[in-house]
């Protein structure tokens, strides 16, 4: 019994003490530029664009919680469209790698590409089917939503190999189905999930 108690005390003493939440805040951002060319006869066009700029704040609370808020400004539009707009605003409980809970407005776990960061896409944008199906720029006549929605999601990494790399990742969420910055208008929810073998 004494050995068990000593082990528990040693383990709790070794846990990393959480920094105050305000000391973990990070400011980041990026600007994406674009060049488009169309050589169709009668419809020739070529142009440089400032596609978008994003500014993000993120941080941790008590080591177990991660949060993020991100704004987007669209570039080279005559009216700025729906810009500036809030694209991410969420908190995620991350105590365990195998079971995390996220709530707020964030990327839907639909398709392989949608959850990926735009910078990880390289020079190419998302494929046309992903931009349509995940709700980037066509939502059956509804607003564009950058592949995001408001909801709650569980996710985790399973079956780690000898080097600690997860072999399976899963995500399952319930979302309003209306896109970003919009309440649920039809009272029906989207249930979206996936499992990735890596």
Indicate residue ranges for each PLM-predicted region.
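Cleavable N-terminal export/targeting peptides
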Residues: 1-18
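Outer membrane beta-barrel
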Residues: 16-38, 42-180, 185-192, 196-198
